[in-house]
Amino acid sequence: MKDIELVYKGEIHRIPNRWDAMNDRQYIRLVGDFLRMAAGELSAGEVRINWLCDIMGWSKRKFHSEEQIANLVAISEQLTFMFQINYPDNNSVLDGVDEDTYELCRRIDPYRLNIPLARVLRRLDYQYVIDLCFCAQLIPSVQIGERSYPGYRIETSFGTLTCSLTALQYVEAQGLIERGEESLPLLAAILYYPEKDYNSERAHELANDFAKLPLETLTAISFNFQAFNNYLFSKTLFSLLSKFAHKPKQPITTDASDALYDLSKEGLGNAKQIEQMNVLTYLKVLRKKTIDAVKDMKGFGWDKLKISEEVGLPISVIDKIL
């Protein structure tokens, strides 16, 4: 998504239209508005306007006339990075449209669209959902009392993705994503673990300290990790690991914690060494295991249907591997 450019009094003003343009304060404040939206206190439009004013340093109180307010709303509606629009039946109404139209309909409210399909979309029960898919660490550290806890690092410089999480940190954090509000302090303690070698028991102890953080901060930490997790499995070569249609019998284990210790059984290191393995190395190993297993089965003379049933991958994915 492109940033927004405005020309005002001969000067060009650029408005960021992306997650990674925020500092930690702006991001946590946005998440606070997401929580208010979930509670029915704010609309999606109000969330966008609040963020626009915050990121640009504008005061909403200075927008008085109808024209000023209309301009503010019009600019805010160009901010498409934070929400997607979900239509019933997994967006089935958009089946068959071209990619550009699909993206437009998922980002722009149907009442603001000027295409024939918009009339159909307006009659449907659609919902705004937060689009959590980005590759950035928006909360580099958190302060609890007198102590600062640095978070995991994500780097994308020079066209290469790196992340400081260990395999065990990642697996444990991933397992907490759907656990709800009560698990947020533990999730934060795992992701902001302060010592070089990650230790699960110590992270559980630290969760009591992280419980002192505001709900907005804890939720922001969770959202950031979810976004990175979604990015890994939709925008990188690791997307292959998200294609399993069902849990295979053998030889691939798709459960993250089981797969972690299966690597130890295969001689890639003892359990401790596997736990401390870098998460991206861990995912590369799982991806290679998946590809090798499919190719081995093909070498045994298995047809694609049998491979699909055994491995759990759709035939279309198996075609790409082979």
Q: What do these predicted ranges mean?
A:
Residues 1-300, 305, 310-322:
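An amphipathic, hydrophobic-aromatic interaction surface with interspersed Lys/Arg
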